[in-house]
């Protein structure tokens, strides 16, 4: 009786609320409060402080109330700076960083990191290399000392190099088992064919077997220079303390290049082309289609990120069905077109890849390509203000939620100083997002998508992947 009474009371209360006429001004108040709160949150983000040592090494930090901190060294070095002969050297060096230094031989480095309860990590991309440690804020002096030892005093012992060859070769086998990784390597290989951006970060297996201590030392001496480095920190750190520690441990990093051979970026042209790797034994097809995108600092990036947010992403494990906000996701669910899809905007210094990747069964590839290109053409010709507003809100949410924790913030600081030369405040990102409207989005999408030659990579049972000329013809509409 009590439960039914509560139910009846709730229902009657709802009916009263529905009959009550509310002022439009009152209806707008929550939205106004939400907007004000978001704007205030942007203004309350801690300032990123940046200093430069005498040798050109940049020191940047964002202080917060966290009891932990993440500190890392970001270096302008990656597979784009490598040649066919030494491709993979940067990735090899990154692995050897954990295998001891001249001051901490063998596993002494890992033991010292574990003794303070810290986490040591490193990664390489096509343009950057990073070494980072997450630890308690009180251990900041030890963390900076360890990072300085890693980037300056790698032992590069012959025995460790030989051991690491097998480790890297096993990792490459594991990467080859990831169809998504393979497809994106294929996409770079065809889109930037004949240029350094076509090279994989790990390098070919023959290079891994052949690289010598001399090759690795030459690469380190050429690229690990102070003006190409950023020491970044986020969390419970004071900038002055970080600067003093950097001065103590990193001021000796050389800024002089041998024979004035300053590493430069080789221009990388984009080529509309395709790579197809058909394997009917695999259960699902992976396909990536991309046009040439803008570089990091290009202002068009914000508008294109809004466009990607409108198209969205999808996975068959999501709820929502045909009621998903993304038109492409709704069509994919209704027609059972794919297992998943995602949009991407991969930026480099002067170019990029802008497109989508999807996973589907063999008989759905043609339809998925058709609907994907239809969404691109629709954004070029008839994007509406309502969906642009939705895309902007999605981008705002992603921008803020991405910077949750000391490690993402530290990565953002290090990467931003290498790519933009500064850390762009969230308030500035918000103002750029706010400027985007439907007309701007249509113009920018037309510039990058409409009647452009795409790069296509397919892997798996891809017999039904349309011919390249047909895919190319889907990049424009005949409108009379």
Swiss-Prot record:
Transmembrane spans: none
Span of chain positions assigned to the transit peptide in the UniProt entry: 1-34
N6-acetyllysine modified-residue sites: 111, 138, 163, 248
Alphabetically ordered keywords of this record: Acetylation, Electron transport, Membrane, Mitochondrion, Mitochondrion inner membrane, Phosphoprotein, Respiratory chain, Transit peptide, Transport
Domain of life: Eukaryota
Residues the record lists as N6-succinyllysine modifications: 163
Tissue: Expressed in neurons and astrocytes of the cerebral cortex and hippocampus (at protein level).
Keyword Transit peptide: yes
Description of the deletion phenotype: Results in early embryonic lethality.
Phosphothreonine: modified positions: 214
GO cellular-component term (any): mitochondrion
InterPro entries recorded: Metalloenz_LuxS/M16, MPP/UQCRC_Complex, Pept_M16_N, Peptidase_M16_C
Presence of the UniProt keyword Transmembrane in the record: no
Gene Ontology MF terms in the entry: metal ion binding; protein-containing complex binding; ubiquitin protein ligase binding
Topological type in the membrane: Peripheral membrane protein
Compartment(s) of residence: Mitochondrion inner membrane
GO biological process: cellular respiration; mitochondrial electron transport, ubiquinol to cytochrome c; mitochondrial respiratory chain complex III assembly; response to activity; response to alkaloid
PANTHER family cross-referenced by the UniProt entry: CYTOCHROME B-C1 COMPLEX SUBUNIT 1, MITOCHONDRIAL (PTHR11851:SF116), METALLOPROTEASE (PTHR11851)
Family that this chain belongs to: Belongs to the peptidase M16 family. UQCRC1/QCR1 subfamily.
Function: Component of the ubiquinol-cytochrome c oxidoreductase, a multisubunit transmembrane complex that is part of the mitochondrial electron transport chain which drives oxidative phosphorylation.
Assembly and binders: Component of the ubiquinol-cytochrome c oxidoreductase (cytochrome b-c1 complex, complex III, CIII), a multisubunit enzyme composed of 11 subunits. The complex is composed of 3 respiratory subunits cytochrome b, cytochrome c1 and Rieske protein UQCRFS1, 2 core protein subunits UQCRC1/QCR1 and UQCRC2/QCR2, and 6 low-molecular weight protein subunits UQCRH/QCR6, UQCRB/QCR7, UQCRQ/QCR8, UQCR10/QCR9, UQCR11/QCR10 and subunit 9, the cleavage product of Rieske protein UQCRFS1.
Protein name: Cytochrome b-c1 complex subunit 1, mitochondrial
